[in-house]
């Protein structure tokens, strides 16, 4: 398993190699990243995935505690992860679908504890959403402890994995609480396919708008394209072209130079289980896992890190492996750390298979039973040690025979005193080796033996002879008194002089000890152990097997003979009592041949307190609608005297989708369960209700579990602990230099309320539509001397998060522990969903009545819908009223009622179920009145005929007068004084644009328009020679009024007259039936404002920035917009709301004039309501429009200049820093926008021409195009209106006639024709200074092409019959 750390030089080296070969190894523009990416702590590290197509290794995303908005992060290039994907504790991440929309294959070449996909403790994750994930080649999945994760029961993992038996999916949000809805099921038009899982045949999807992809059965095990065409057999996951192994998303076997192949071609080698590389590539890969290695090797046509078992490199410079003769030699050792310390079986395991140890061998094994066999398995092959061998304090060793193949100690490095073999203080060592079958040589250096009471001196002398060291040792090197002699005595007492304690360390010093001959004082040994009671002795815990409960530390003599010796004991447990004593190690003899030494008395000392660990096994259950019972177990490590607990709780917002969906379909109502566990708590104030089975059976009891079930649960619990330990050990990297932050101190700074017996003062309105976005405060309470509490005064049937913190006696200084938490829901309150107060009714026209009723004040969670039962004789009719409809109208309308007496009752439905029916309300529907006698008809008929004739005469007169006035008019448009009026002439009549409803298919939501939701879909036969066309489908809300529906269709009717490449096309209308649909050309890149903002360079992008548009691209956008507006102008239409938000960007980046009004709800803040009028786009309006409500083509040109400013600033808000009222005054007083930073002069001069205060001084759209036509792309000539046959130059007689129509305005027009082509002085900044008309010093000519046209041609803006496009809905202009 690879390390979990993300940074490090090996990763950098891998990255350099992969980057250099990426273009030749993968057909896309992305890179191969590896050998693993670890993203932790900072969400901005996700930028490392920017260009990754394949991650050759693992991907970790974990430990990001600060909730962030991940919607701006999207990595569509990533398609394959060759090892595994791990997500752990990433706050704020709600779905993986936007993050990795095209992740298709997880190969599982190496696994994380047998899993290829691990999602663990992701508290905010709502769905997985990897809708393009098709294959997990090896390994299982583990999805655990994700409290808000849904859409797990709707995924058929058998379509992704070969076997699902090892999958582990537990501890997530219960499926009954999720209300998982696959696309189309709510509208009863399901879009997903069905499969059977656990005998349930159901739809399969990833999210509410993403189905799970299934290939046709004819493909078998082959992948398929998005259009369900079978891929080549060598493709895995998906492909772009059927039966083509060069367009696979991933390869089933191996990838080589853009082609998926079943085996690597000759001269290439398998690498990382998925691709083929050549020899040069393999030779240049650094071996990240072994500093001693010479790089990767080639064996059995595979490029790998090391030779397999039984093989060895044939030379140090070769990349190839050869079979070993006998055991394979293996050199071990570290150039930096030359001494290999063996203090446990784990450390010995690092020498498994080693035959030559380059360096020194230090054996220090103090405890362990039957450890010799383990050491022989791991160290038995060692033959040569190049340095020294030192064996000390190894009380578990009886013999050194586990080094059964050791034959040579070179002694190239020696201990002080020239020792190459050093044996000190091994209490149970009895034998070195069997010298009858051993040949060991110590080539250089001496031997030293001391304090081995069970090792005979004769054994030592035998080793002298065999190893050839006899004569090298002095008399003191092999002491006959302390080897082989168990007796020892200490005549002097050492006294401790000082002790200093921390939570995990102790410093002790003792007085200077001076034996008669100071040279015989070798060192000190400190013994210490945990001692809960002060009753330990020196010999506790020692036995013949070498077990010793005392820990020992060697202490060298202080360099200063006068200094006091001391030791720092570290790695201790907080708030733990330790017993400590010290021995002096000497060689001094007394007359009776006993060792003379010194020893201290046993000292008892306690470490300081520390922050406790978290409480364990937190459980919660509800015993009433306002109480939650919470129980937990004490922490494993109190690290002090446990004093109290802090209990904190927070109300959780409802799921957002509950506010959006219409739950009038009974089978779609989400189910919630309260915390119904059983906890033995003395404070329970309400007797829980016992479920009765009926009859004499008495209360229902759970069946006892069988022994097999208990054993299975036990094994599963053990396996779960092993996995969690493995997870934490793999991903948590120690950072000793980092200071720990106090959890409770941080938490307490954000608390909004605190009380020992807290009452939740909940004043939030449950019906607030924004409630699901509310962050509720935490409340807290202190619990003393017990591990349980009851939280009271809670809301009924509401979900709460409960955090428990442990606190010991030092909590005021150190803080409390981190929290362990649980989610629990209170019980529903009886009667909470009942509708209070009376139900009233109001008569309405056309045999209708309107019922009104109050909403439940404190319902069980959330009211989802209301049901009305009504009838004249019996209540046999039902009407469902959604939550959204009730909030909009405050009641419901019953239509098409027959005359007579009626009764009605109403019932509310919440998350917990149904409330009670209201008392019946009685109402009467009168019959329609009829003429009482025939005379009324005789009298009324002539009157009606006269009225009709009079009306026709008035209409003819008005029409004639309007036509005459239009001939004399100036082409201006005035805002209506009664914009809410509409006549019968506005009613929409179906025509040749009508499309059959069955030809339309909706796929996904694109956004909210002025009248309703806009969807992406497919239409059949709406475009000539195209069987199917991707389209945008505009809808009108179900609750829309008749006027709104007519406006919706009339707005579409306006678009019927347009046929221009740079104006979004109308493709059809579906007006028959409900809902009404308008079919538009699909603009895949959205509105221009959003597109421009997506091009903004982000801060700290690590050299991976999106490139803002160049000058040529800006000019191209401007020309395309101007061409669309010129077309509207030629057809005598005035737009009135030209802005970047109302321009759309096509797939090929062409900018077009949008379908007017689609973006009103999205950019509501761009509009301003002046007085009691409708919404006005004041920041884009010309001075004359703001003053007089006048809208002409000239005012559209002003707005066009603002659009140019938006393009140059990447859609900043115009007049930033000014309120709407200030903008109103500023523009009317002559103020202009600043020149944007880094704006080209050419573009800004064009803006200034559009912002002439005198409307007649502004250029026309045709003149604007003429000034920049040379900068446009060649394709512009082929598609534009400017170069089309429709754009014919006007006849001279027509120009003269139009000039004669406006004599009253000629005094404000300069007589010099060149004035029309000159720029104005630079406008003032936001200081309020006005921009004067006319040329000034330093003016520049914008384009000579202005002069090529007839002088004053751009002044001819007042044209006969000029019409205006309607502003978006709710505007009165």
Curated annotation (Swiss-Prot):
It comes from the Eukaryota. Glycans are attached at residues 51, 102, 135, 245, 314, 418, 439, 535, 608, 623, 641, 748, 757, 765, 901, 914. Residues 1306-1322 have a biased composition (Low complexity). Disulfide bonds join 33-52, 150-178, 182-205, 192-211, 215-224, 219-230, 231-239, 235-248, 251-260, 264-276, 282-303, 307-321, 324-328, 332-354, 456-489. Residues 742-936 are extracellular. It is a single-pass type I membrane protein. The chain crosses the membrane at residues 937-960. The modification Phosphoserine is found at residues 1280, 1284. Autophosphorylated on tyrosine residues in response to ligand binding. Autophosphorylation occurs in trans, i.e. one subunit of the dimeric receptor phosphorylates tyrosine residues on the other subunit. Autophosphorylation occurs in a sequential manner; Tyr-1167 is predominantly phosphorylated first, followed by phosphorylation of Tyr-1163 and Tyr-1168. While every single phosphorylation increases kinase activity, all three tyrosine residues in the kinase activation loop (Tyr-1163, Tyr-1167 and Tyr-1168) have to be phosphorylated for optimal activity. Polyubiquitinated at Lys-1170 and Lys-1173 through both 'Lys-48' and 'Lys-29' linkages, promoting receptor endocytosis and subsequent degradation by the proteasome. Ubiquitination is facilitated by pre-existing phosphorylation. Pfam families: Furin-like (PF00757), PK_Tyr_Ser-Thr (PF07714), Recep_L_domain (PF01030). Disruption phenotype: Deficient mice are 45% of the size of wild-type littermates at birth, and die shortly due to severe organ hypoplasia. ATP binds at residues 1006-1014, 1034. Residues 1-30 form the signal peptide. A motif (IRS1- and SHC1-binding) lies at residues 978-981. It is found in: Cell membrane. Residues 1283-1373 are annotated as: Disordered. Residues 1323-1332 have a biased composition (Basic and acidic residues). Residues 1000-1276 form the Protein kinase domain. Residues 490-610, 611-709, 735-829, 835-928 form the Fibronectin type-III domain. Tetramer of 2 alpha and 2 beta chains linked by disulfide bonds. The alpha chains contribute to the formation of the ligand-binding domain, while the beta chain carries the kinase domain. Interacts with PIK3R1 and with the PTB/PID domains of IRS1 and SHC1 in vitro when autophosphorylated on tyrosine residues. Forms a hybrid receptor with INSR, the hybrid is a tetramer consisting of 1 alpha chain and 1 beta chain of INSR and 1 alpha chain and 1 beta chain of IGF1R. Interacts with ARRB1 and ARRB2. Interacts with GRB10. Interacts with RACK1. Interacts with SOCS1, SOCS2 and SOCS3. Belongs to the protein kinase superfamily. Tyr protein kinase family. Insulin receptor subfamily. Receptor tyrosine kinase which mediates actions of insulin-like growth factor 1 (IGF1). Binds IGF1 with high affinity and IGF2 and insulin (INS) with a lower affinity. The activated IGF1R is involved in cell growth and survival control. IGF1R is crucial for tumor transformation and survival of malignant cell. Ligand binding activates the receptor kinase, leading to receptor autophosphorylation, and tyrosines phosphorylation of multiple substrates, that function as signaling adapter proteins including, the insulin-receptor substrates (IRS1/2), Shc and 14-3-3 proteins. This is Insulin-like growth factor 1 receptor.
């Amino acid at each position: 398993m690879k390390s979990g750390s993300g940074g490090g030089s090996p990763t950098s080296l891998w990255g350099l190699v992969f980057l250099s070969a990426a273009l030749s190894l993968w057909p896309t523009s992305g890179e191969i990243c590896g050998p693993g990416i670890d993203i932790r702590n900072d969400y901005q590290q996700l930028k490392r995935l920017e260009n990754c197509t394949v991650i050759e290794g693992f991907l970790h995303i974990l430990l990001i505690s600060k909730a962030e908005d991940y919607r701006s992060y999207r990595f569509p290039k990533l398609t394959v992860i060759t090892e595994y994907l791990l997500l752990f504790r990433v706050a704020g991440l709600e779905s993986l679908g936007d993050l990795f929309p095209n992740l298709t294959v997880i190969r599982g070449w190496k696994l994380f504890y047998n899993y290829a996909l691990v999602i663990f403790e992701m508290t905010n994750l709502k769905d997985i959403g990897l809708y393009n994930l098709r294959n997990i080649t090896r390994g299982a999945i583990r999805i655990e402890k994700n409290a808000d994760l849904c859409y797990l029961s709707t995924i058929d993992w058998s379509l992704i994995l070969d076997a699902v038996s090892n999958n582990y999916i537990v501890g997530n949000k219960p499926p009954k609480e999720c209300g998982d809805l696959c696309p189309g099921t709510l509208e009863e038009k399901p879009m997903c396919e069905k499969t059977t899982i656990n005998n349930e045949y159901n739809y399969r999807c990833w999210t509410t708008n993403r189905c799970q992809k299934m290939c046709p059965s004819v493909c078998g095990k082959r992948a398929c394209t998005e259009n369900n065409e079978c891929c080549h057999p060598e493709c895995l996951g998906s492909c772009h072209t059927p039966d083509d192994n060069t367009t696979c998303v991933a390869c089933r076997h191996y990838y080589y130079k853009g082609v998926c192949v079943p085996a690597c071609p000759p001269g290439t080698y398998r690498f990382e289980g998925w691709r083929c590389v050549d020899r040069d590539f393999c030779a240049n890969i650094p071996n990240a896992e072994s500093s001693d290695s010479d790089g990767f090797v080639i064996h059995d046509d595979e490029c790998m890190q090391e030779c397999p078992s039984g093989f060895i490199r044939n030379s140090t410079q070769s990349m190839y492996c050869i079979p070993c003769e006998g055991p394979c030699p293996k050199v071990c050792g570290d150039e930096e750390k030359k001494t290999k310390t063996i203090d446990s079986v784990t450390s010995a395991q690092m020498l498994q298979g080693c035959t030559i140890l380059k360096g020194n061998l230090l054996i220090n094994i103090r405890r362990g039973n039957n450890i010799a066999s383990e050491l022989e398995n791991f160290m038995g092959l060692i033959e040569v040690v190049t340095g020294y061998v030192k064996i000390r304090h190894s009380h578990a060793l009886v013999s050194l025979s586990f080094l059964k193949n050791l034959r040579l100690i070179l002694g190239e490095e020696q201990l002080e005193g020239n020792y190459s073999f050093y044996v000190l203080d091994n209490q149970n060592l009895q034998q070195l080796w069997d010298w009858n079958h051993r040949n060991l040589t110590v080539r250089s250096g001496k031997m030293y033996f001391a304090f081995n009471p069970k090792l005979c001196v004769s054994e030592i002398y035998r080793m002298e002879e065999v190893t050839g060291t006899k004569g090298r040792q002095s008399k003191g090197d092999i002491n006959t008194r302390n080897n082989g002699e168990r007796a020892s005595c200490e005549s002097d007492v050492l006294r401790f002089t000082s002790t200093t304690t921390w939570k995990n360390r102790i410093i002790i010093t003792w007085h200077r000890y001076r034996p008669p001959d100071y040279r015989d004082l070798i060192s000190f040994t400190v013994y210490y152990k945990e001692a809960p009671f002060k009753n330990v002795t020196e010999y506790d815990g020692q036995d013949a097997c070498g077990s010793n409960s005392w820990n020992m530390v060697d202490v060298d003599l202080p360099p200063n003979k006068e200094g006091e010796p001391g030791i720092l004991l570290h790695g201790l447990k907080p708030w733990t009592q330790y017993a400590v004593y010290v021995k002096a190690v000497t060689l001094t003899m007394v007359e009776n041949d006993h060792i003379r030494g010194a020893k201290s008395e046993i000292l008892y000392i306690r470490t300081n307190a520390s922050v406790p660990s978290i409480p364990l096994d937190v459980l919660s259950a509800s015993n009433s609608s306002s109480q939650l019972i919470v129980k937990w177990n004490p922490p494993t490590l109190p690290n002090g005297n446990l004093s109290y607990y802090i209990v904190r709780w927070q109300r959780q917002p409802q799921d957002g989708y509950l506010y959006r969906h219409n739950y009038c379909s009974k089978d779609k109502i989400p189910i919630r369960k309260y915390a119904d566990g059983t906890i033995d708590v003395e404070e329970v104030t309400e007797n829980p209700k016992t479920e009765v089975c009926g009859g004499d059976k008495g209360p229902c009891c759970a069946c006892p579990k069988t022994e097999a079930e208990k054993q299975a649960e036990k094994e599963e619990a053990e396996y779960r602990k092993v996995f969690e330990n493995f997870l934490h050990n793999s991903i948590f990297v120690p950072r000793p230099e980092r200071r720990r932050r106090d959890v409770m101190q941080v938490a307490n700074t954000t608390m909004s309320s605190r009380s020992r017996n807290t009452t939740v003062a909940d004043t939030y309105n449950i019906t607030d539509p924004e409630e699901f976005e509310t962050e509720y405060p935490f409340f807290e309470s202190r619990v003393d001397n017990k591990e349980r509490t009851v939280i009271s005064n809670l809301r009924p049937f509401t979900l709460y998060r409960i955090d428990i913190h442990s606190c010991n006696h030092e909590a005021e200084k150190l803080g409390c522990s981190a929290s362990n938490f649980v989610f629990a829901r209170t019980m529903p309150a009886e009667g909470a969903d009942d509708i209070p107060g009376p139900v009233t009714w109001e008569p309405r026209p056309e045999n209708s009545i309107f019922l009104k009723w109050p909403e439940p004040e404190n319902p069980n969670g959330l009211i989802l819908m209301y049901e009305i039962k009504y009838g004249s004789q019996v209540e046999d009719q039902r009407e469902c009223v959604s939550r959204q409809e009730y909030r909009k109208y405050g009641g419901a309308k019953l239509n098409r009622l027959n005359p007579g007496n009626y009764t009605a009752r109403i019932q509310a439905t919440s998350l917990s179920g149904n409330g009670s029916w209201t008392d019946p309300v009685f109402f009467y529907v009168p019959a329609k009145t009829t003429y009482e006698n025939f005379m009324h008809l005789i009298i009324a008929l002539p009157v009606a005929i006269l009225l009709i004739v009079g009306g026709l005469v008035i209409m003819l007169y008005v029409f004639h007068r309007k036509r005459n006035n239009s001939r004399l008019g100036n082409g201006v448009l005035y805002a209506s004084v009664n914009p809410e009026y509409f006549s019968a002439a506005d009613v929409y009549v179906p025509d040749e644009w009508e499309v059959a409803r069955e030809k339309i298919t909706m796929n996904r939501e694109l956004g909210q328009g002025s009248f309703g939701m806009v969807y992406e879909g497919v239409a059949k036969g709406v475009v000539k020679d195209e069987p199917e066309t991707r389209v945008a489908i505009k809808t009108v809300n179900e609750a829309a009024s008749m006027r709104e529906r007519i406006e919706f269709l009339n707005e579409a009717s306006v678009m019927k007259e347009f046929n221009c490449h740079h104006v979004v096309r109308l493709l059809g209308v579906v007006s028959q039936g409900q809902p009404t649909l308008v079919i538009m050309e699909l603009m895949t890149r959205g509105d221009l404002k959003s597109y421009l903002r997506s091009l903004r360079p982000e801060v700290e992008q690590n050299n991976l920035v999106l490139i803002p548009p160049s000058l040529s691209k800006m000019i191209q956008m401007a020309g395309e917009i101007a061409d669309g507006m010129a077309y509207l102008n030629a057809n005598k239409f005035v737009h009135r709301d030209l802005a970047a938000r109302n321009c759309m960007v096509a797939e090929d980046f062409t900018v077009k004039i949008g379908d007017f009004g689609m973006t009103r709800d999205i950019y509501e803040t761009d509009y301003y309501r002046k007085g009691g009028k409708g919404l006005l786009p004041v920041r884009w309006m010309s001075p004359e429009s703001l003053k007089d409500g006048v809208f002409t083509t000239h005012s559209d040109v002003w707005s066009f200049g603002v659009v140019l400013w938006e393009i140059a600033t990447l859609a900043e808000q115009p007049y930033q820093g000014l309120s709407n009222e200030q903008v109103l005054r500023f523009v009317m007083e002559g103020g202009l926008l600043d020149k944007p930073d880094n704006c080209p002069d050419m573009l800004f001069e064009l803006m200034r021409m559009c912002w002439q205060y005198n409307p007649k001084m502004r250029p026309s759209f045709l003149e604007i195009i003429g000034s920049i036509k040379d900068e446009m792309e060649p394709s512009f000539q082929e598609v534009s209106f400017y170069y089309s046959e429709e754009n014919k130059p006007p006849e001279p007689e027509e120009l003269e006639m139009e000039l004669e129509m406006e004599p009253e305005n000629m005094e404000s027009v300069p007589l010099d024709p060149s004035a029309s082509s000159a720029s104005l002085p630079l406008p003032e900044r936001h200081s309020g200074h006005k921009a004067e008309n006319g040329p000034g010093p330093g003016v520049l000519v914008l384009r000579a092409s202005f002069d090529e046209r007839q002088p004053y041609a751009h002044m001819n803006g007042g044209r006969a019959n000029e019409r205006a496009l309607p502003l978006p809905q709710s505007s009165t202009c």
